[in-house]
Amino acid sequence: MIRGFEAPMAENPPPPPPPVIFCHDSPKRVLVSVIRTTPIKPTCGGGGEPEPPPPLIPTSPGFSDFMVYPWRWGENAHNVTLSPGAAGAAASAALPAAAAAEHSGLRGRGAPPPAASASAAASGGEDEEEASSPDSGHLKDGIRRGRPRADTVRDLINEGEHSSSRIRCNICNRVFPREKSLQAHKRTHTGERPYLCDYPDCGKAFVQSGQLKTHQRLHTGEKPFVCSENGCLSRFTHANRHCPKHPYARLKREEPTDTLSKHQAADNKAAAEWLARYWEMREQRTPTLKGKLVQKADQEQQDPLEYLQSDEEDDEKRGAQRRLQEQRERLHGALALIELANLTGAPLRQ
């Protein structure tokens, strides 16, 4: 009987171990094991022949790696082919919607977290309507603000090679609508971080002054952004956060009262002195800040990732004056050439 068992076992080797997928290009190295159903070993019947194995139950999803890993949805959502007549079209359509919600959530546009992406797709793309609406703050004076999408950077560089704009990066030929945006962009090539946090034992440096001011709220304990839902008291330090109770609600800026804003306790004497200087400077700047907030919408809420503080507007004015002076010099040079041509052509006409 033992020999009768050896033959069937040799003909039916044990199934291979489940495959292992390594994701090398993800932010963290992740090990994912795809589970498969292992059939029960066949038992010997009366005639010595093994019974046919039962059919395997497919438990591993037929998804490629860009569907398995959420942080790659935005990169490969265009590879998904939707079949309008298929029965699972509604289920497969939730994936690109999740990718769009994930991407917009990273941008800080008030989109819901990725867990709510399926319901966002069922609601008819509310996030896209909010992003394109006039009151979303994404467009101002006809000029698009903030950091462009990654897939449009190459087009912007190609456009800059043939553009007549003088606000151009001399390294990558990309053009910008404002001088201060160009200055901030050049620091991505040079690695310069001129704005240093002077809080005791901090020393972090930033590319833009607005990033420094946002960072210093961690030291001061300020939380100027509140949930716009009525009755919700949740406050946040940054404009690109989501209220856990109301993920679809936008955040609005509301300067906290003195009891809330100055509640942060100092760890030592140096920190206490720094906080005292900070609040003294804030009180001196408060009337100016209120006037600016009335005149225009808060730029940090328009684009938290690339917030440009208004104290850099002097650079833009100086750049405009320099360009105006260059245009005047070109005009004077052209007039001088015309006059010289007239003088040299006068003897020929005589």
Swiss-Prot record:
InterPro entries: Znf_C2H2_sf, Znf_C2H2_type. The modification Phosphoserine is found at residue 310. SMART domains: ZnF_C2H2. A zinc finger (C2H2-type) spans 167-189, 195-219. Its main location: nucleus. One of its GO terms (cellular component) is nucleus. PROSITE patterns: ZINC_FINGER_C2H2_1, ZINC_FINGER_C2H2_2. GO terms for biological process: regulation of transcription by RNA polymerase II. It comes from the Eukaryota. Keywords: Activator, Coiled coil, DNA-binding, Metal-binding, Nucleus, Phosphoprotein, Repeat, Transcription, Transcription regulation, Zinc, Zinc-finger. Residues 137-151, 316-327 have a biased composition (Basic and acidic residues). It is found in: Nucleus. Pfam families: zf-C2H2, zf-C2H2_6. Residues 104-151, 290-327 are annotated as: Disordered. Residues 308-342 form a coiled coil. One of its GO terms (molecular function) is DNA-binding transcription factor activity, RNA polymerase II-specific. Belongs to the krueppel C2H2-type zinc-finger protein family. Transcriptional activator. Isoform 1 may be involved in transcriptional activation of erythroid genes. This is Zinc finger protein 367. It comes from Homo sapiens (Human).
